[in-house]
Amino acid sequence: AIMVTMAGGKTALEKEIGMNNILFFLLPKAMCAFLDEDSTIRQAMEKMESAGYSSIPILNKRGEYRGTLTEGDLLWALKYLCFMDMRQAEIHRISEISRRKDNVPVRVTTSMHDLIDRASTQNFVPVVDDKDAFIGIVTRRSIIQYCKQTLFPED
């Protein structure tokens, strides 16, 4: 990734935004879909379908980020748990599913450089506060849309 650092240690994007604050891109917890770690497989499938997400954050009862569940994780779970009946999906919990890869969260104080670096490998970046409470996500799409509007304002 190419990042141009300006005087004062800020990247060109940080200078353009006028801040080093990932809250500019944050989709707050109240506006994004997520799963409780005790959710059933069926609940996970239904929530992901209704939200249109291919991956979704998992939170514990305290609201802390615990990981990411993907469509691929669900597909492999159906194979390994050997069921095609949705009633079985009501019995099994997402905690029984092996997850291929969790999206790594960032703190709300993370630099724009680190946020963009993380977003380059994850379709969304979970954001946590200093007590590890999940406060929302930053989507790769929101960063790309901002860059497009900034670089090509005539579009």
Residues covered by each model-derived region:
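Short, basic/aromatic recognition patches
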Residues: T40-E46, T109-D114
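Short glycine/proline-centered loop/turn elements that form peptide/ligand docking sites
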Residues: M31-C32, I41, Y65
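A glycine-centered beta-loop-beta connector
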Residues: M48-A51, I56-D73, A119, V127-S142
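Tandem CBS (Bateman) regulatory domains
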Residues: V4-M31, T70-Q122, T139-D155
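A short beta-loop-alpha structural element at the N-terminal edge
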Residues: L35-D38, R107
